[in-house]
């Protein structure tokens, strides 16, 4: 169950009430969100939730508090970390630079050193 209480600035107590209600209704896990640059309110929520519920998985998406380590998150009872858009956001500048270089040089040779070999891509597909 996804809880947006912290994003809506309704506070930790509202988030906790919702989390406990969702678990009572059969939720398999709790995903708690925050836009804050520090994990303080996430940690407060997790510590209070864990004081009453030690088994329901807690999921976080630390996009805004990205300096927080997985070990720090785990220390507060968080079970799953989702890196929601970091791969897409890092891939786009590389694709943009490659496209610009192809346009600049009117060919693809200058981007060869940045390309993954086709054989390696095929190997990845075979593993799936």
What are these regions, as identified by a protein language model?
Residues 1-83, 89-100:
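Alpha/beta enzyme core
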Residues 86-128:
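Extended, intrinsically disordered, low-complexity segments
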């Amino acid at each position: 169950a996804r809880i947006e209480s912290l994003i809506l600035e309704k506070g930790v107590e509202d988030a906790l009430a919702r989390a406990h209600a969702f678990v009572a209704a059969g939720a398999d896990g709790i995903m708690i969100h925050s836009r804050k640059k520090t994990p303080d309110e996430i940690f407060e929520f997790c510590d209070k939730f864990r004081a009453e519920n030690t088994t329901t998985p807690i999921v976080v998406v630390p996009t805004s508090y990205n300096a927080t380590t997985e070990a720090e998150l785990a220390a507060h009872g968080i079970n799953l970390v989702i890196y929601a858009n970091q791969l897409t956001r890092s891939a786009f500048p590389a694709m943009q630079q490659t496209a610009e270089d192809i346009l600049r040089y009117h060919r693809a040779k200058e981007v060869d050193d940045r390309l993954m070999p086709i054989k390696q891509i095929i190997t990845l597909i075979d593993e799936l």
